[in-house]
């Protein structure tokens, strides 16, 4: 079963962890600065396929140590945009697939540079705007007689 590390246990990160867990096809570790939010989610929803953990990306050595002690296949960053280059560097160093939700163009450029030559997928900008906005736009276009 693939193992995924979700960084950030806010609303989006918790939703991502819950949805992945609900498929029954992933073992998920959900991390936040403290154990409070991930543990609360796991306890309230009885998510047996989600392991709560406390990680601080401002301490990349500790995050890298945690990643190195597990067999993760991918990392999903639902952290603030400025944390993503650090997460991308850890993903690259540990040969993980990488996803983030940022819309920040400069950070996306840095992630692209980090990913050059990697043999894993690095997919930034998986957030609300490119996905949901495209769906809404497609629906609205269907209401026009001509474009």
What are these regions (language model features)?
Residues 120-147:
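Rossmann-like dinucleotide-binding core of oxidoreductases
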Residues 101-124:
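Rossmann-fold NAD(P)-binding glycine/threonine-rich loop
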Residues 4-8:
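Conserved N-terminal Rossmann-fold NAD(P)-binding element of oxidoreductases
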Residues 45-59:
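Rossmann-fold cofactor-recognition segment
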Residues 57-71:
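Conserved Rossmann-fold cofactor-binding substructure of NAD(P)-dependent oxidoreductases
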Residues 57, 74-85, 95, 101-106:
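N-terminal glycine-rich "phosphate-gripper" loop used for MgATP/nucleotide binding
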Residues 34-37:
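Helix N-cap at the beta1-alpha1 junction of Rossmann-like dinucleotide-binding domains, i.e.
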Residues 12-13:
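Hydrophobic/small residue at the entry helix of a nucleotide-binding pocket
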